Amino acid sequence: MGTSRLYTLVLVLQPERVLLGMKKRGFGAGRWNGFGGKVQEGETIEDGAKRELREESGLTVDTLHKVGQIMFEFVGEPELMDVHIFCTDSVQGTPVESDEMRPQWFQLDQIPFTDMWPDDSYWFPLLLQKKKFHGYFRFQGPNTILDYTLREVDKL
């Protein structure tokens, strides 16, 4: 395994629904996902998460709650993705489509797992139960999980 790069993922999770975005271009295009991306130099992880949410959905947020951290390895890629996962139930603004993402609300019993990253169906249940977690997923290409670990933790 090589070096890692910091990424963020933000889920707007309200009592009956979750906001996801359809990725329109780049890494993960054609899949529903939370909002996030690379943390920029000189930026805290949380500030990066807030910036990505604003850029991709038009929403602003005061408080984020860190709920998980997952390391992703893609066979053949030298860099690991160190993804810090946040959620919030309170945002300002109305979701708007950006050049990268098309936001849409989903009822919690209608989350489109078949059109999401394959790992989401493993850790989303922990997120919905308001549990914190650490994970590692090793992928062969974008669709095949070769190996994974996922555990609930008390704190991150």
Curated annotation (Swiss-Prot):
PROSITE patterns: NUDIX, NUDIX_BOX
Keywords: Cytoplasm, Cytoplasmic vesicle, Hydrolase, Magnesium, Membrane, Metal-binding, Nucleus, RNA-binding
Cofactor binding mode and count: Binds 2 Mg(2+) ion per subunit.
Sequence positions that bind Mg(2+) 2: E52, E55
The protein's enzyme class: hydrolase
Residues that bind Mg(2+) 1: G36, E56, E100
The protein's Enzyme Commission number: 3.6.1.56, 3.6.1.-
Keyword Magnesium: yes
Short motif (Nudix box): ranges: 37-58
Reactions this protein catalyses: 2-oxo-dATP + H2O = 2-oxo-dAMP + diphosphate + H(+); 2-oxo-ATP + H2O = 2-oxo-AMP + diphosphate + H(+); 8-oxo-dGTP + H2O = 8-oxo-dGMP + diphosphate + H(+); 8-oxo-dATP + H2O = 8-oxo-dAMP + diphosphate + H(+)
Cofactors required: Mg(2+)
GO MF, any single term: N6-methyl-(d)ATP hydrolase activity
Binding site for 8-oxo-dGTP: K23
Compartment(s): Cytoplasm; Nucleus; Nucleus membrane; Cytoplasmic vesicle, Secretory vesicle, Acrosome
A Pfam family assignment: NUDIX
Listed GO biological process terms: DNA protection; purine nucleoside catabolic process
Its biological purpose: Oxidized purine nucleoside triphosphate hydrolase which is a prominent sanitizer of the oxidized nucleotide pool. Catalyzes the hydrolysis of 2-oxo-dATP (2-hydroxy-dATP) into 2-oxo-dAMP. Also has a significant hydrolase activity toward 2-oxo-ATP, 8-oxo-dGTP and 8-oxo-dATP. Through the hydrolysis of oxidized purine nucleoside triphosphates, prevents their incorporation into DNA and the subsequent transversions A:T to C:G and G:C to T:A. Also catalyzes the hydrolysis of methylated purine nucleoside triphosphate preventing their integration into DNA.
Cited PANTHER family: 7,8-DIHYDRO-8-OXOGUANINE TRIPHOSPHATASE, OXIDIZED PURINE NUCLEOSIDE TRIPHOSPHATE HYDROLASE
Subunit structure: Monomer.
Annotated family: Belongs to the Nudix hydrolase family.
Entry protein name: Oxidized purine nucleoside triphosphate hydrolase
